[in-house]
């Protein structure tokens, strides 16, 4: 009889815990109805699974329907054992009024206030998960620059001190031994305000993985996570119905960030800034553009990184005197693809904040200074969202990523009334606080507001942890302050340096094509502009340098005249022979971008002999934009030598002289086609 005594089994699901009194000889499928009575009403019965560990953690999960003919005693369950229950909700299921009322009563905010029954909880888990990566140092693929800096020693070499060093030229002592890249005295001497990312990483790695402990390696970096974890193993209902100390974030203590992901922003040419300023000079409105370039090593800072800007693309926007409103950018992926073919990537954003001083000497009003702000709370939130879109992958982080290399630059006036560039990044904490919806911009630009749980404007319940920061009080003592309702934006900001190269060597040398989305000031991109830039040149040697223009490349990409297949056929026998000897079939658009960035005449000769180039010339001719006619030769003049073999005129067929009226008609025809 002892064998038939009922036993107690414990069950745990994400909806809570419950117990069932069962017989050891009872079959598992007979438990379905008892289990359903303790689960929500919209559970799909066929989706119930049982496991010896929490669902999703690698336990032995079995479907309840698949345990047909299996009794409880056969799997070795004893009195008091615990099983974990997984299930899925029925799609399109309706909740009964009684359950809806009970659920509404259970929804409470942290301050005890009930969530109104009419409020629909629309909170969804964020797309950015806090899940860790197993062995990130083996599976995460970093950028080549990060791999290069990881291999460097990073030590700061010092010469032999003639006064303090008593050893020979091959010896070493405390006064001349190399310093670590994060040495505070060296940074203070060189007036380096922030550590570089790789210097900071080595600093915390020395504290995390000590050689004398002989312990297994642990990634030293960990991204802050200020959101409620929805994979809590405690078994309670997910937030906002339930919360515990395991899934709720800790209090946030803000402090200035001691490192920066990028140390310097270098603009390859002053023309990049002047072209952006031209819009403000002509319209009086502000302008925004995205920076395309590369990341390179910055030798002025130990293990430093700099962003080298080669082009600025201006997306669709509405420009006003006091700000910019961005519109949907439909061809963003196409522009990114053109940049990728040129060896570039999106490295940052730049915008103007200028107001003429009215003196007539070109001076502007100084808005941003130590007594006002350097980057407003709205701009910090904007920069944080962009940095969240472009995370940095690194093998030194538990999640496989840490921070972002995306930079934010501002063109504004300084104390002397001159236009200057300022470069910033939002801190890692700022990005996470914006992502977690903890803060919001304020009408006062120098402070950031902390969200309130009672704010129902977003139609969702929030978890707002406590936020603190430290400041010097009236007694000259550093005291901790509560950040609610607002706190200074300086805690969310990191400053960068900027500059221009000593010898300008821009990637794009002929940036004269009209800039995109400037119709409001009478500048537009059309076939006439392409013809003026390309077809007007009679010699191919003059045409090849003209394609070195990022805005022209983006416009030609939109025309889809260059093939993206690996089949380049040539038209003439001579050209086919030259191409066979010089090149193999390849992507025409990739060749176009390579010519624009390498400025190689040999590659340019291959380009003008491709079908895509011939198609472009034909389009320009048919639209009324023909190349100028060859001048008529005087019989008394000596004959001109033939051009080099393999070169041909841009025109694919000879032209006969036309009257001025016919030429004018052709131009009107071209205008009607646009």
UniProtKB/Swiss-Prot annotation:
GO-annotated molecular function: ubiquitin binding; ubiquitin protein ligase binding
An annotated GO cellular component: nuclear membrane
Gene3D superfamilies the record matches: Phosphatidylinositol 3-kinase Catalytic Subunit, Chain A, domain 1
Organism annotation: Aspergillus clavatus (strain ATCC 1007 / CBS 513.65 / DSM 816 / NCTC 3887 / NRRL 1 / QM 1276 / 107)
Feature: compositional bias, Basic and acidic residues: 655-665
Protein purpose: Involved in the import of nuclear-targeted proteins into the nucleus and the export of poly(A) RNA out of the nucleus. Has a role in the endoplasmic reticulum-associated degradation (ERAD) pathway.
Disulfide bonds: none
Location of the protein in the cell: Cytoplasm, Perinuclear region; Endoplasmic reticulum membrane; Nucleus membrane
Region (Disordered) location: 623-674
Membrane topology: Peripheral membrane protein
GO biological process: mRNA transport; protein transport; ubiquitin-dependent protein catabolic process
Keywords: Cytoplasm, Endoplasmic reticulum, Membrane, mRNA transport, Nucleus, Protein transport, Translocation, Transport
Family: Belongs to the NPL4 family.
High-level lineage: Eukaryota, Fungi, Dikarya, Ascomycota, Pezizomycotina
InterPro entries linked: MPN, Npl4, NPL4_C, NPL4_Zn-bd_put, Ubiquitin-like_domsf
Location (main, coarse): cytoplasm
Name the record gives this protein: Nuclear protein localization protein 4
Domain MPN: 265-402
């Amino acid at each position: 009889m002892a064998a038939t005594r009922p036993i107690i089994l414990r069950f745990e699901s994400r909806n809570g815990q419950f117990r069932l009194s069962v017989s050891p000889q009872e079959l598992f499928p007979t438990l379905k109805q008892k289990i359903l009575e303790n689960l929500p009403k919209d559970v799909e019965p066929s989706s119930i699974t049982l496991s010896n560990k929490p669902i999703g953690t690698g336990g032995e999960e079995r479907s309840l329907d698949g345990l047909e003919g299996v009794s409880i005693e056969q799997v070795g369950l004893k009195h008091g054992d615990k099983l974990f229950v997984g299930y899925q909700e029925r799609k399109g299921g309706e909740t009964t009024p009684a359950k809806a009322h009970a659920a509404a009563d259970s929804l409470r905010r942290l301050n005890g206030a009930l969530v109104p029954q009419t409020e629909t909880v629309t909170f969804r888990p964020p797309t950015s998960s806090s899940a860790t990566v197993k062995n990130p140092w083996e599976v995460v693929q970093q950028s080549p620059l990060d791999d290069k800096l990881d291999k460097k020693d990073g030590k700061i070499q010092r010469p032999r001190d003639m006064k303090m060093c008593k050893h020979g030229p091959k010896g070493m002592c405390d006064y001349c031994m190399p310093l670590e890249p994060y040495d505070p005295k060296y940074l203070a001497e060189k007036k380096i305000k922030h550590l570089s990312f790789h210097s900071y990483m080595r600093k915390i790695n020395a504290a995390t993985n000590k050689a004398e402990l002989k312990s297994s390696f642990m990634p030293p970096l960990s991204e802050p996570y200020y959101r409620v974890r929805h994979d809590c193993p405690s078994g309670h209902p997910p937030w906002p119905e339930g919360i515990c100390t395991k899934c709720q974030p800790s209090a946030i203590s803000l402090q200035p960030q001691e490192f920066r992901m990028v140390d310097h922003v270098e603009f390859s040419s002053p023309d990049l800034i002047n072209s952006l300023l031209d819009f403000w000079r002509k319209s009086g409105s502000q302008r925004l553009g995205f920076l395309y370039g590369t990341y390179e090593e910055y030798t002025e800072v130990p293990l430093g990184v700099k962003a080298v800007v080669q082009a600025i693309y201006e997306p669709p926007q509405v420009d006003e005197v006091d700000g910019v409103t961005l519109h949907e950018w439909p061809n963003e992926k196409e522009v990114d693809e053109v940049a990728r073919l040129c060896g570039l990537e999106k490295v940052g954003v730049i915008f103007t904040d200028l107001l003429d001083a009215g003196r007539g000497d070109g001076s502007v009003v100084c808005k941003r200074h130590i007594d006002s702000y350097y980057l407003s709370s709205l701009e910090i939130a904007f920069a944080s969202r962009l940095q969240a879109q472009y995370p940095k992958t690194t093998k030194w982080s538990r999640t496989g990523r840490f921070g972002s290399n995306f930079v934010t630059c501002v063109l504004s006036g300084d104390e002397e009334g001159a236009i200057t560039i300022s470069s910033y990044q939002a801190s890692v904490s700022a990005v996470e606080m914006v992502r977690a919806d903890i803060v919001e911009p304020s009408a006062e630009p120098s402070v950031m507001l902390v969200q309130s749980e009672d704010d129902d404007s977003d139609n969702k319940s929030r978890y707002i942890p406590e936020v603190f920061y430290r400041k010097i009080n009236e007694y000259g003592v550093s005291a901790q302050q509560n950040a609610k309702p607002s706190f200074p934006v300086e805690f969310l900001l990191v400053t960068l340096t900027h500059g221009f190269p000593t010898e300008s060597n821009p990637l794009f040398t002929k940036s004269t094509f009209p800039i995109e989305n400037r119709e409001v000031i009478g500048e537009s991109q059309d076939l006439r502009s392409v013809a003026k830039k390309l077809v007007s040149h009679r010699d191919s040697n003059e045409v090849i340098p003209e394609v070195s223009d990022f805005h022209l490349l983006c416009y030609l990409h939109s025309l889809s005249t260059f093939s993206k297949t690996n089949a380049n056929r040539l038209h003439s026998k001579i050209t086919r022979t030259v191409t066979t000897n010089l090149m193999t079939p390849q992507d025409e658009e990739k060749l176009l971008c390579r010519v624009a960035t390498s400025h190689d005449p040999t590659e340019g000769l291959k380009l003008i002999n491709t079908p895509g180039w011939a198609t472009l010339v034909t389009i320009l001719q048919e639209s009324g934009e023909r190349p100028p006619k060859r001048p008529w030769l005087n019989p008394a003049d000596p004959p001109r030598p033939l051009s080099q073999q393999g070169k041909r005129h841009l025109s694919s067929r000879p032209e006969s002289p036309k009257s001025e009226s016919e030429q004018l008609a052709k131009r009107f025809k071209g205008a009607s086609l646009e």
